[in-house]
Amino acid sequence: MATNTYVALDKITVGSAVASVTFSSIPSGYTDLVIIGNLGTTSGSANIAMQVGNGSIDTGSNYSFTNVNGDGSSAASSRASNQAQIYIDYSAYPTTTLTSTYIWQVQNYSNATTYKTVLGRSNTASRGTNATVGLWRSTSAINTIKLDTQSTTFLSGSTFSLYGISNAGDATPKATGGVYLTTNTAGAGAGTNVFATSVTDILDYSNVNKNK
């Protein structure tokens, strides 16, 4: 049976304009995290930045990122290292209406032995699309995430939904019964077809012989 891989963990809805939103006490029982934002800002000309941490937000110069963006007629790219945050949109800012969509994926967030990678995508109808890959240079597990407008505020009604991504495991269908055709390879019946009536018959050669 299929299992849900996206598990809703939290949702923040901005009631009145705020400069940032923070998810804290994020549980560790998932593989990745995904945040989906539907948002706008009061200025329409500010980057959206991400900072993460363990117990508290890391504000040090421990982030780097590479960004590409395009609007259908031109494209650009940029990269920066030793930053205090990861910019997700860099140049195609959100608008002053609730029409900008952002998706952040934080990979292996609870792993305590590797640096953490963030994949970001944003889409603003009048300003194009962005894709970003960022890095937090820390082996600490992540349990708090902050999204910041840098110099303005998120509009009232902006939403941020946090999901945990779990490993769905092996969903490959497996046989549990039925009729199978096999071929004897030894003894007096070598080369003859044998009908086995169950998986047990296939796995147990003595049962297959009984059905000759």
Language-model features, listed with the residues they occupy:
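Surface-exposed molecular-recognition determinants
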Residues: A2-K212
